[in-house]
Amino acid sequence: MSSFTIPSPSSFSLSNSYNQTSPHSFTLRNSRSNFEFHRLRLDVESRRRSTSLRSNCSTKGTDSGENENKSVLDAFFLGKALAEVINERIESTVGEVLSTIGKFQAEQQKQVQEIQEEVLERAKKAKERAARETMEEQGLVASKPVAITRNPDAVVVASVTSTSTVESKTIMVDVEESSSSSDED
């Protein structure tokens, strides 16, 4: 059994028996008077989103008018202490839930950024590929890189001009006419 004291105008002790059926079952006692909450039980069901609080109250001995007023005040402060404990538990649980949600959101944001980077990278590669294909179609770039092997003993010809057979005949005719006209003179 664990117990701790809740600070308040009068001293209270809160104990939780771990061998009880509910992990949220408490007994509140006031050391100044004989007032107790027995089997104070907090049930939180996440499936149905419901919270219930059950308790049994009792005082030991007979009460006179003054003791009755003390008992009422004690009950008030016990209720206040109980509400504080419940609020702390709820705040703790809500904090854990919000923390978990934050972690999930951070993971999701990271995945979204990775996908965006991958899409941008693929778009860049597709753009480069399309530009290269366009240049190949226009003949500005060879479609496949050609390996050039150099032979140091070979003679390099800087330029080669080909002439067609029609041009060759024309040249020959001009030469013959010019030579025959020079014979006539």
Curated annotation (Swiss-Prot):
One cellular component term from this protein's GO annotations in UniProt: chloroplast membrane
Compartments, as annotated in UniProt: Plastid, Chloroplast, Plastoglobule
Domain of life: Eukaryota
Name of the featured protein: Uncharacterized protein At4g13200, chloroplastic
Example of a GO biological process term: thylakoid membrane organization
Natural source organism: Arabidopsis thaliana
Biased composition (Polar residues): 52-64
Annotated region described as Disordered, given as residue ranges: 48-67
Keywords: Chloroplast, Coiled coil, Plastid, Transit peptide
Any coiled-coil regions, as ranges: 105-138
Transit peptide, from-to: 1-56
